[in-house]
Amino acid sequence: MLNEFKQFIAKGNVMDMAVGIIIGAAFTAIVTSLVEDLINPIISLFTGGLDFSGLGLALTEGEEAAVFAYGNFIMAVINFLIIAWVVFLLVKMVNRIKEMAENEPEEAPAEDPGPTEKELLMQIRDSLAKS
């Protein structure tokens, strides 16, 4: 499943990308809350109170110093991975449904029932009449 996820991220058709954009936009608030309110506190618990959102490197000194805020980037990456995983699962489900629909056996055409009883009797009569 992880290899399929890697392949999905590495390549995809336009439909996959469209689904990703739509689902990503719809789940942005939910995923952001998930990361900020649930995942980060758990990570913080195991890292001794480390908060990713506050991580950064001050490039200059002063009140309005330029900051290289790599903590926010880490949070954005986590958000992206969660959204991409959800989209991957959705596309995988859609592909499975399409595959099941394609593999459904089509109704076999009705077999030729052959001549009716009346037709058979007529053939026998004609054969007897010729002899």
Swiss-Prot record:
PROSITE patterns, alphabetized: MSCL
GO molecular function: mechanosensitive monoatomic ion channel activity
InterPro entries the UniProt entry points to: Mechanosensitive_channel_CS, MS_channel, MSC/AndL, MscL_channel
Transmembrane segments: 14-34, 71-91
Subunit structure as annotated in this protein's UniProt entry: Homopentamer.
Family designation: Belongs to the MscL family.
Function: Channel that opens in response to stretch forces in the membrane lipid bilayer. May participate in the regulation of osmotic pressure changes within the cell.
Name this polypeptide is given: Large-conductance mechanosensitive channel
